[in-house]
Amino acid sequence: MDRHANMGVLIDEGTLAQTRITLAELLRNEPSSDKIFELVQQLVQEQPADLSDQLDQLTGTWELRWSSSSQPWLKQSPGLLNLQILDPNQGRGRNILQLGGPLGQFAGIQVDADISVVSQQRVNVCFKRGGWAGPTVAGRKLQLLRSIEQSFPAWLDITVLDDALRICRGNAGTIFALVKRPEIRLPDWTL
């Protein structure tokens, strides 16, 4: 009986691994696929994140590839790059929305936040400043940012996490699916 129970676990782990691979491929190549929501729901139920063991996996630059929102800036678009940088060890986060292609460095919106991991899945977010962010010229980052007075609590519940994929739910209930962009390094938070 134990042998069969172990086989079931192996089959389930294999199925979960294939589901993750399929979802990651769809997010990269077909982000408007109708199959994404079903795969997201399956992974959230069967493979919950645990930030007490996965904090290093959370750290890095993530690209939004799908969301349950109808807002255009929260939808994947070929001409728009939507990044989220999380550095929980430094307590910092950054959202970047910019045009794709070579002009993207001149037309970006940046929102900086303080973040803190408060449970096995929850990351509290306190937005601090936001505005236009341009290129770095002569070692100086060109930007025009204003302070933000956040009047509501914000958080992300990280529901699925591995080295390449993150699924989370925001405080407004929106579900996000992001892929890791390891080639985009963490920023110098002092600039």
Regions found by a protein language model. Give the residues of each.
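Soluble ligand-binding/transfer domains with enclosed cavities or grooves
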Residues: 2-191
